[in-house]
């Protein structure tokens, strides 16, 4: 039996997204812009470069209020052109 994400979370709760994208200066700004649309707040994302420096990992934590917000953000973050993966 599959456990669904909304069965594991009790809202509101902190929820961290890890966004991997091409190492371009605008990556962090684009991630924060999308997050602000769905979960307004004051964010200080953590950025880590890949070993070769071609990609950056941006970790950002929101206070999620419902499962639809979590799912929408996964979808919207994945639509950013320079993003390769959202975890």
Curated annotation (Swiss-Prot):
**What is the protein's given name?**
UPF0250 protein SG0794
The record ties this protein, via Gene3D superfamilies, to: 3.30.70.260
Sections of the chain in a coiled coil? none
Homology family: Belongs to the UPF0250 family.
- Pfam families on file: DUF493
> Which NCBIfam families does the UniProt entry name for this protein?
PRK04998.1
Write down the superkingdom of origin.
Answer: Bacteria
A single GO CC term, please? cytosol
């Amino acid at each position: 039996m599959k456990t669904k994400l909304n069965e594991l979370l009790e809202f509101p709760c902190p929820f961290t997204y890890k966004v991997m994208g091409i190492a371009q200066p605008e990556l962090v700004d684009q991630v924060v812009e999308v997050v602000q649309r769905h979960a307004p707040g004051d964010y200080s994302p953590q950025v880590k470069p890949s070993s070769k420096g071609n990609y950056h990992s941006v970790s950002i934590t929101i206070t999620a209020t419902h499962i639809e917000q979590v799912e929408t953000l996964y979808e919207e973050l994945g639509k950013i052109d320079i993003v390769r993966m959202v975890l």
